[in-house]
UniProtKB/Swiss-Prot annotation:
Coiled coil residues, start to end: 239-285
Keyword terms of this UniProt record: Cell cycle, Cell division, Centromere, Chromosome, Coiled coil, Kinetochore, Meiosis, Mitosis, Nucleus, Phosphoprotein
Assembly and interaction partners: Component of the heterotetrameric kinetochore subcomplex COMA, which consists of AME1, CTF19, MCM21 and OKP1. The COMA subcomplex is part of a larger constitutive centromere-associated network (CCAN) (also known as central kinetochore CTF19 complex in yeast), which is composed of at least AME1, CHL4, CNN1, CTF3, CTF19, IML3, MCM16, MCM21, MCM22, MHF1, MHF2, MIF2, NKP1, NKP2, OKP1 and WIP1. COMA binds the centromeric nucleosome-binding protein MIF2, and to the outer kinetochore MIND subcomplex. OKP1 interacts directly with AME1, with an NKP1-NKP2 dimer, and with CTF19-MCM21.
Protein name per the record: Inner kinetochore subunit OKP1
Regions of compositional bias (Acidic residues) in chain numbering: 69-78
Modified sites of kind Phosphoserine: S70
Name of encoding gene: OKP1
Transmembrane segments: none
Amino acid sequence: MAADRDNFLQNIENDSINNGQAMDLSPNRSSSESDSSILMNVNDIKTLRLDVAPEAKSTQSKKSLFYENSDDAEEGEIEERTNKEEGQYHHKGSKQLRFEVGKESTGKLQSHLSDGSATSGEGNVRPWEFRKVIQAEYRERLPRNYELKHWKKPSKIMIGSILRLLETNTVSALDSVFEKYEKEMNQMTHGDNNEVKRIYSKKERLLEIILTKIKKKLRQAKFPSRISERDLDIEYIYSKRQFIQNRYSQELQNNERLEAILSREQNLLEETRKLCMNLKTNNKKRLTEKLIQKDLHPVLNKAMEYTYGLESTNGFMHPDGPVTFRNDSHELNLMLNDPIKSTADVRLDKEEVLSLLPSLKEYTKKSKELKETMGQMISDSHEEEIKEVFVPHHESHQDKTEEDIH
């Protein structure tokens, strides 16, 4: 009976294993994760056996977290995926290039394939693939015409500086998260501080594990060769920030001081300009007064008048009138209340002038008589001169003719 019972259980176990393999190899396997887990539990013969004690949950299926995967396994998966993608694209390219196509079409095809592979590679990047993530971030932040050709693995100093930056933010990140979800934590723990501390310490250990994982991945990643070790050092970043702030404040102070100096110089320039104008006008007035009073040397009078514009070429100053007339009026004490009328304003008839000035009649009469007498005297004198010249000549000519006759 015992042997038959063991054979029966063995047959059931073999049938369940065969059914499981057939389900795994079937192409139309489209059930959900919950259904597959139920089938696995049903098909597992050990769960149905009553003569064997059930195994612990930890030994049955141990759940692996995303940060606990081994680096070698992850790298193997990445290499297998990249090889498969390259094989697929190579196979597609070889199929399309079997036909005779022009060079332009083949170039377009190759560029299209390269663009497609790049986009698919960037789209399928996982967070822990630091090499691809770093390259994608640098290419996204840098301009399109800038190309990074040389990459290198980070040094220990660079990795230490990056981890130092992350470690300084872990405490603040934990505190901010616990402050944000304080009500939920109190509701879940019913105000038990020990439970809250336990959760806090658990999250600290989780962050420590993540940091160790980041450290391992950073060793395998690559950074641009132009980045130096000190660019990611927290002390260098802080000192550089402080230096820039101090320099900026210094430049602001210098700018304010220059603005104050500039405004002061502008005010001084305006004052000097006004002073020069006042001095020029005062010198002009003083020189005119001295020229009027003739306090200067007589040799300098005319030169000063022409040099300082006190007298123009026509003998007149611009606002004050002729200098000579002012000198004469000052010397002769001429005080004229009425303005002098010009000849253009006097419009009188000849009869009115003769009536006002009777002496002009005598003057005109005498001038006429003088003209007549002068003309008569000139004519008489001319006649006498002509007679004196022509009469002796005529007599001499008559004598010569008589001599010739004889």
